[in-house]
């Protein structure tokens, strides 16, 4: 009998800007254009170098959606020498590759052409679907229109980009909405074969936001959503939970087979009140299962060659490194 495997990625989390065109009712990440709203290139490079020294394999670039739509942002970025946020993330992706880190970008809504450009320097990319429902929390967030998000996930499939998506629980959606969201994701994967993993993420209320007093999903509700995801999604799509946002050890038996990216250096800037578990805690969460490190591009996509030629030497080198005999998971 094969031992169950739970995977994770060792990453660096780089929030390139907190400026965002959306105003979601549950978000504490967004800020206006102001001093310090852009991660300085020197800080980004220091973070990449320190993370590589700690054995990380992934550089997770996250930033607010369409920050250039917010007045004053592009002028501020221009003073750093970049025309727009995509120029900046492209430059830092190259810097990550040079330091033996595989880039994964989560940028919010991107056009087909923008996805195609970033595909050259990213091993994988992501966009949370969140929900197919029209919920009040997204009333002031044009980028959270479900049709717009589905179109981007589909475009990523057309471009054969290994992709992460997911659902967000507790933002005003119903159980039927969750099922519909998962079926949409499953259908996109059956058509394009590009969804690596689906995150089942629970909403965490933030002080000072419109939803600070909203009810949160309990463990049974989260577990039921995980089980539903495992039932609906194709077998080759991983079901992931963020191990810092819920009682992961209680949920692991519901169908979870991935614990996402965790960092030995950087915090979760979207949920800063929830620290990442470190390796010993991940082992405890995995229980009797084998805890196995992975890259941000899953093995089946490496085998299929679904990556830019620029990334091939690094992908091969890192895949060999994490598979080396005697290497402890995450060492």
Swiss-Prot record:
<comment type="similarity">
    <text>Belongs to the radical SAM superfamily. CofG family.</text>
</comment>
<dbReference type="InterPro" id="IPR006638">
    <property type="entry name" value="Elp3/MiaA/NifB-like_rSAM"/>
</dbReference>
<protein>
    <recommendedName>
        <fullName>7,8-didemethyl-8-hydroxy-5-deazariboflavin synthase</fullName>
        <ecNumber>4.3.1.32</ecNumber>
    </recommendedName>
</protein>
<feature type="binding site">
    <location>
        <position position="20"/>
    </location>
    <ligand>
        <name>[4Fe-4S] cluster</name>
    </ligand>
</feature>
<comment type="pathway">
    <text>Cofactor biosynthesis; coenzyme F0 biosynthesis.</text>
</comment>
<dbReference type="GO" id="GO:0044689">
    <property type="term" value="F:7,8-didemethyl-8-hydroxy-5-deazariboflavin synthase activity"/>
</dbReference>
<dbReference type="InterPro" id="IPR013785">
    <property type="entry name" value="Aldolase_TIM"/>
</dbReference>
<dbReference type="GO" id="GO:0005506">
    <property type="term" value="F:iron ion binding"/>
</dbReference>
<keyword id="KW-0949">S-adenosyl-L-methionine</keyword>
<keyword id="KW-0408">Iron</keyword>
<dbReference type="GO" id="GO:0016765">
    <property type="term" value="F:transferase activity, transferring alkyl or aryl (other than methyl) groups"/>
</dbReference>
<comment type="subunit">
    <text>Consists of two subunits, CofG and CofH.</text>
</comment>
<dbReference type="GO" id="GO:0051539">
    <property type="term" value="F:4 iron, 4 sulfur cluster binding"/>
</dbReference>
<dbReference type="InterPro" id="IPR007197">
    <property type="entry name" value="rSAM"/>
</dbReference>
<keyword id="KW-0411">Iron-sulfur</keyword>
<keyword id="KW-0004">4Fe-4S</keyword>
<dbReference type="InterPro" id="IPR034405">
    <property type="entry name" value="F420"/>
</dbReference>
<feature type="binding site">
    <location>
        <position position="24"/>
    </location>
    <ligand>
        <name>[4Fe-4S] cluster</name>
    </ligand>
</feature>
<dbReference type="InterPro" id="IPR019939">
    <property type="entry name" value="CofG_family"/>
</dbReference>
<comment type="function">
    <text>Catalyzes the radical-mediated synthesis of 7,8-didemethyl-8-hydroxy-5-deazariboflavin from 5-amino-5-(4-hydroxybenzyl)-6-(D-ribitylimino)-5,6-dihydrouracil.</text>
</comment>
<keyword id="KW-0479">Metal-binding</keyword>
<feature type="binding site">
    <location>
        <position position="27"/>
    </location>
    <ligand>
        <name>[4Fe-4S] cluster</name>
    </ligand>
</feature>
<dbReference type="Pfam" id="PF04055">
    <property type="entry name" value="Radical_SAM"/>
</dbReference>
<feature type="domain" description="Radical SAM core">
    <location>
        <begin position="6"/>
        <end position="244"/>
    </location>
</feature>
<keyword id="KW-0456">Lyase</keyword>
